[in-house]
């Protein structure tokens, strides 16, 4: 057995993908260097799509990875983890992402609506997974936090870049007075 299995760890994902009904990438976020180049990533995505787009199942094993997926109208959602990762946790991430987008897009989860709201997608993915580590599994919380990003967020919930931007704004206004 590998030492990796024996070490306690947080639940992690290797990638989150959204492909259209032709297998083309709409969104892809890889959290490790399993596929370091864009060429390798796109080849992997085509391979996943070819294996999964005609089946009704929700899970596949491909290239030593566990892939959970779901389709909606003209989109295919994928969450990829190692072969040792808990499939239920991967499915929880997938359902959280899908349900969050469904709420944000008012149940209109299709390619056109997604492309018009890519910022919300990026924010939702960042709320659910950070650096491959699963942070949130409640779609209500994700939607709430994504909505807050446009408003004043408490300092404890802001990212470093948000804090720096806020500090710049305050300094700028204090100098202009």
From Swiss-Prot:
Any GO CC annotation of this UniProt entry: COPI vesicle coat
Membrane topology classification: Peripheral membrane protein
InterPro entries assigned: AP_mu_sigma_su, Clathrin_sm-chain_CS, Coatomer_zeta, Longin-like_dom_sf
Location in or out of the cell: Cytoplasm; Golgi apparatus membrane; Cytoplasmic vesicle, COPI-coated vesicle membrane
CDD domains in alphabetical order: Zeta-COP
Cell cycle in keyword set: no
Family annotation (Gene3D superfamilies): 3.30.450.60
Source superkingdom: Eukaryota
Key word Protease present: no
UniProt record similarity statement: Belongs to the adaptor complexes small subunit family.
Its job: The coatomer is a cytosolic protein complex that binds to dilysine motifs and reversibly associates with Golgi non-clathrin-coated vesicles, which further mediate biosynthetic protein transport from the ER, via the Golgi up to the trans Golgi network. Coatomer complex is required for budding from Golgi membranes, and is essential for the retrograde Golgi-to-ER transport of dilysine-tagged proteins. The zeta subunit may be involved in regulating the coat assembly and, hence, the rate of biosynthetic protein transport due to its association-dissociation properties with the coatomer complex.
Assembly and interaction partners: Oligomeric complex that consists of at least the alpha, beta, beta', gamma, delta, epsilon and zeta subunits.
Name the record gives this protein: Coatomer subunit zeta-1
The species this protein was found in: Bos taurus
Native organism taxonomy: Eukaryota, Metazoa, Chordata, Craniata, Vertebrata
Name of the gene this protein is made from: COPZ1
């Amino acid at each position: 057995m590998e030492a990796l299995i024996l070490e306690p760890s947080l639940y992690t994902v290797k990638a989150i993908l959204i492909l259209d009904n032709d297998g083309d990438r709409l969104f892809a976020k890889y959290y490790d260097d399993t596929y370091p180049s864009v060429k390798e990533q796109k080849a992997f995505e085509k391979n996943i799509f070819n294996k999964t787009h005609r089946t009704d199942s929700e899970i596949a094993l491909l290239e030593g990875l566990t892939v959970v997926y779901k389709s909606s109208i003209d989109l295919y959602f994928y969450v990829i983890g190692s072969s040792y990762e808990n499939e239920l946790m991967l499915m929880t991430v997938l359902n959280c992402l899908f349900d969050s987008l469904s709420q944000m897009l008012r149940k209109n989860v299709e390619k056109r609506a997604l492309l018009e709201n890519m910022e919300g997608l990026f924010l939702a993915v960042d709320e659910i997974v950070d650096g491959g580590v699963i942070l949130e599994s409640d779609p209500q919380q994700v939607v709430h936090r994504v909505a807050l990003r446009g408003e004043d967020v408490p300092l404890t919930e802001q990212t470093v870049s948000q804090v720096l931007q806020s500090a710049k704004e305050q300094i700028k206004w204090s100098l202009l007075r």
